[in-house]
Amino acid sequence: MMIIVMLLLSYLIGAFPSGFVIGKLFFKKDIRQFGSGNTGATNSFRVLGRPAGFLVTFLDIFKGFITVFFPLWLQVHADGPISTFFTNGLIVGLFAILGHVYPVYLKFQGGKAVATSAGVVLGVNPILLLILAIIFFIVLKIFKYVSLASIVAAICCVIGSLIIQDYILLVVSFLVSIILIIRHRSNIARIFRGEEPKIKWM
């Protein structure tokens, strides 16, 4: 029972719509009505400006980061292979990612899970996140597309999990990569059409 409560709590925390709340609270804007219509960090930078964008990014990363430690903090004990699987920090973090993408508070229309996924990886393997961040910014510097950099970093996470032989991370990163590609399908189409906005600060 405690495992179910923990996973539900992780989902609900992940579902907290940082961009939407910051937009409404400080700018009286529904961020979903501007830019890409997304509630995540990238659209927050675009619509609300850099300070708000950084705040939303921090909050979204933090959501994923703290949920990784729920099994430890809540002292949830596993007594079998199934319960052991669902008390793994990565699996608990996955529920936060799903909450971010499909938030119950906003009729299941959320962000694209990049920052929250980064928070989960930060909690599990900071060195891997550092490597992925370097890859992200290299791709971003070259191509100027946040969406492309995010997808490449996610795929590299899958490859990295194979290299370090972390098979739960492999499962989670593969699922997240699929989610990211699906959530970025309109961005991918715009890139091929040459219509995807490029960043101007790098």
UniProtKB/Swiss-Prot annotation:
EC nos: 2.3.1.275
Keywords: Cell membrane, Lipid biosynthesis, Lipid metabolism, Membrane, Phospholipid biosynthesis, Phospholipid metabolism, Transferase, Transmembrane, Transmembrane helix
Organism domain of life: Bacteria
Ion transport found in the keyword field: no
Pathway(s) it belongs to: Lipid metabolism; phospholipid metabolism
Annotated GO biological process: phospholipid biosynthetic process
Membrane-protein topology: Multi-pass membrane protein
Catalytic reactions of this protein: an acyl phosphate + sn-glycerol 3-phosphate = a 1-acyl-sn-glycero-3-phosphate + phosphate
InterPro entries found in the cross-reference section: G3P_acylTferase_PlsY
Subunit text: Probably interacts with PlsX.
Function: Catalyzes the transfer of an acyl group from acyl-phosphate (acyl-PO(4)) to glycerol-3-phosphate (G3P) to form lysophosphatidic acid (LPA). This enzyme utilizes acyl-phosphate as fatty acyl donor, but not acyl-CoA or acyl-ACP.
Designated name of the protein: Glycerol-3-phosphate acyltransferase
Organism: Staphylococcus aureus (strain NCTC 8325 / PS 47)
Phylogenetic lineage: Bacteria, Bacillati, Bacillota, Bacilli, Bacillales
